[in-house]
Curated annotation (Swiss-Prot):
GO terms for cellular component: cytoplasm. Keywords: Allosteric enzyme, Carbohydrate metabolism, Hydrolase. Gene3D superfamilies: 3.40.50.1360. GO terms for molecular function: glucosamine-6-phosphate deaminase activity; identical protein binding. Allosterically activated by N-acetylglucosamine 6-phosphate (GlcNAc6P). Catalyzes the reversible isomerization-deamination of glucosamine 6-phosphate (GlcN6P) to form fructose 6-phosphate (Fru6P) and ammonium ion. The lineage of its organism: Bacteria, Pseudomonadati, Pseudomonadota, Gammaproteobacteria, Enterobacterales. The record marks 151, 158, 160-161, 254 as: Part of the allosteric site. This is Glucosamine-6-phosphate deaminase.
Length: 270
C-alpha cells in the first residue's frame, strides 16, 4: 500500500487528477481498448473533478476512449433529483468533458428488480475485463462506496441498508433532514472494488483520521472496510495532513520519505 501525504485538500485534488491523467495517457486508449475508470461521488472528489475538467480543457487529456463506472446510487430517488448521483456526476464532471454518453455507467436506483440490476452492472464491468483504476473516498467509519461496517470483504454489487451515521453525514445534502436521506442504496461490493487493477482512495479532513489509521496501521477487519486495501496488490491513499493525525509520527515520516521524490516533484509544479 502507498500513502501520499499532502498538505491540504486542494493538493489532494490536484495530485489525484494529475495521477489519473498520467494513467489514461500512458494507457493510450482506443475505441477497441478503452481505459476503464471507477468513480465516486461526495464532497472529497470535487477538487479532483474540477482539476480533471481544467486539464481536459487545456488539452492535457481526452475522455473519448474512457469508460466510467460509478460506485453507487441511492434507491428510490429519480435520476434528475438534485441529490441523485446521476445528477451529481453530470453536474460536477461528466457534462464538462468529451466522454461519449454510451461510455458512462451508473447504477439504476429505480430498477424494478434491484438484484437483476446489480448483476447487470457486475456483468458489464466484467465485459471489459477489469477496472483499470478505481478512485474512491472513505467515510468517517471507514466505509468505501456504501459498503458499511461489517460488510463482507468478498461482497459484490448489491443493495445495502445505510447506517444512521452515514445518513446523518449525508443529511447535509438534504437540508440537514435525515428523514429525506434514502435508507437504501445500490453499491459495488468490496470484492468488486478489489477486482480493480488499482485502487486510489482520497481522504481529507480530521474526521477521516481514524479511518486512515485503521487502513494503514490496523488489522484487516470487516468493521473497517477500508482495511481491505491492505490485501490489494496496488492500492494508494492520497490524503491531507489533518487526515494523518491518528497515525504514528514514525508512520507519517516513513511515507514522507518513501514518496519524497513524488511529493517534491508535485510541490515544485504548484
Amino acid at each position: 500500500m502507498r500513502l501520499i501525504p499532502l498538505a491540504n485538500a486542494s493538493d489532494v485534488g490536484k495530485w489525484s487528477a494529475h495521477y489519473i491523467v498520467s494513467k489514461i495517457n500512458a494507457f493510450n486508449p482506443t475505441a477497441e481498448h478503452p481505459f476503464i475508470l471507477g468513480l465516486p461521488t461526495g464532497s472529497t472528489p470535487l477538487a479532483t473533478y474540477k482539476e480533471l475538467i481544467a486539464l481536459h480543457k487545456a488539452g492535457k487529456v481526452s475522455f473519448k476512449y474512457v469508460v466510467t463506472f460509478n460506485m453507487d446510487e441511492y434507491v428510490g430517488i429519480t435520476e434528475n433529483h438534485p441529490q441523485s448521483y446521476h445528477h451529481f456526476m453530470h453536474q460536477n464532471f461528466l457534462d464538462h468533458i468529451d466522454i461519449p454518453k454510451e461510455n458512462i455507467n451508473l447504477l439504476n436506483g429505480n430498477a424494478s428488480d434491484v438484484e437483476t440490476e446489480c448483476q447487470r452492472y457486475e456483468d458489464k464491468i466484467k465485459s471489459y475485463g477489469q477496472i483499470h483504476l478505481f478512485m474512491g473516498g472513505v467515510g468517517n467509519d471507514g466505509h468505501i462506496a456504501f459498503n458499511e461496517p461489517a460488510s463482507s470483504l468478498t461482497s459484490r454489487t448489491r443493495i445495502k441498508t445505510l447506517t444512521v451515521e452515514t445518513r446523518t453525514a449525508n443529511s447535509r445534502f438534504f437540508d440537514n433532514d435525515i428523514n429525506q436521506v434514502p435508507k437504501y442504496a445500490l453499491t459495488v461490493g468490496v470484492g468488486t472494488l478489489m477486482d480493480a487493477e488499482e485502487i486510489m482512495i482520497l481522504a481529507t479532513g480530521l474526521n477521516k483520521a481514524q479511518a486512515i489509521q485503521a487502513a494503514i496501521e490496523g488489522n484487516v477487519n470487516h468493521m473497517w472496510t477500508i482495511s481491505c486495501l491492505q490485501m490489494h496488490p496496488k492500492s494508494i491513499i492520497v490524503c491531507d495532513e489533518p487526515a494523518t493525525m491518528e497515525l504514528k509520527v514514525k508512520t507519517v515520516k516513513y511515507f514522507h520519505q518513501l514518496e519524497a521524490d513524488i511529493i517534491g516533484e508535485f510541490a515544485s509544479k504548484k
